Amino acid sequence: MSIASVASVFKGEHAVGSTVTVRGWVRTRRDSKAGISFLAVYDGSCFNPIQGVVPSSLENYDNEVLKLTAGCSVIVTGEIVESPGAGQAYELQVTHVEVTGWVEDPDTYPMAAKRHSIEHLRELAHLRPRTNIIGAVARVRNCLSQAIHRFYHENGFVWVSTPLITASDCEGAGEMFRVSTLDMENLPRTSDGKVDYDKDFFGKEAFLTVSGQLNGETYACALSKIYTFGPTFRAENSNTSRHLAEFWMVEPEVAFATLSDIASLAEGMLKYAFDAVLAERMDDLQFFAQHVDKTVIERLQSFVSSDFAQVDYTDAVEILQKCGREFEFPVSWGIDLSSEHERYLAEEHFKAPVVVKNYPKDIKAFYMRLNEDGKTVAAMDVLAPGIGEIIGGSQREERLDVLDMRLEEMDLNKEDYWWYRDLRRYGTVPHAGFGLGFERLVSYVTGVSNIRDVIPFPRAPRTANF
């Protein structure tokens, strides 16, 4: 008995006439007056289910096959034949059906054939992978993550596992989840009435990380080229389609690199990942183009064939001020560009992905390298047509005196960053890196606009089920 995935059958990896066994779940059952049933069986290996043609001569045809409904799990054995119908190249002439799991009450099964709204599916996150849309998102997400790992491996990067529990605030934003084992009903107090974190598990305040960057820099300053790829956390009370409390970040860090170097790295990585999806997951992309966003395939093809534009923040502000468009948020030098500004630049002005660089220092983090003008830092955002900002990065401040000045300006205690400052004391080196919000990337590739639908179990304000 040869076990086959549905994808391997459709790819022609098994000869016509050979017998294979497919294990999966029933999507639909259709019965013919000619005494045969058609089972659509999917196993998640590709978008389309395979059709099994089941004759009534099977001994369990009446008492089992005719009772199969959407969601039942089955093991189906049959001969691969060329399909006479349109839509798929092969089907199975079934010789054996084993039912491994029934759906208790088909009338109340939440994932029955009828279509559900994407909002309703969020309430059923444990079952939604069974739907066409979430299954397709999962395969594209996997393809993108595998491609990103391949890209960095092929380019000589070392993958570093940075800690999820930290004592430092990388962004200086303060919106962090506290990690504590203290009894909330009976908190220990210091003499001045504050919570005594000396009595806590780590002997100090600890938080879930907002970024692996600072830890990543320590390894880049020894191994030259590293990247992190893992979960990060923001206790930002934003209930929007663009925010999650827990999400994944890709963060490369490169020693002896400038802002220009990492802009090129970002372009190379994105194009590599998009090429992989176009090559490997066209079945899923066709579904998204048909049911979610008709431009997804064309958008990715255009992205990989376009050269990235580059513009200084100061020039971008001037472009926005002179374009004649009335924005919801007025543009002036010193503001952080909003999504409408970013999308205008990428979609209407440059009509290509664009790198905006050299932002005002007052709207950027303490670790970004101060430029010679004393007003801007060597920071960049990569803006993509259709979504806006997809990557944010910078050259890091490698000069200890300037770093200390920036920490002071932002009211951050330099003693908390003693180990980060050590990197500047012992063989300091220019270095640079960026962060890619992985869910935002998946959203861009699939056209699925709400970021809560591109991560298996979304975590957001008042949302931590499953």
From Swiss-Prot:
Chief location bin: cytoplasm
Pfam families: tRNA-synt_2 (PF00152), tRNA_anti-codon (PF01336)
Secretion signal, residue range per the UniProt entry: none
Assembly and interaction partners: Homodimer.
EC number(s) from the headed UniProt entry: 6.1.1.22
GO biological process, one term: asparaginyl-tRNA aminoacylation
Subcellular location: Cytoplasm
Species annotation: Shewanella sp. (strain MR-7)
Main EC class the enzyme belongs to: ligase
Name this polypeptide is given: Asparagine--tRNA ligase
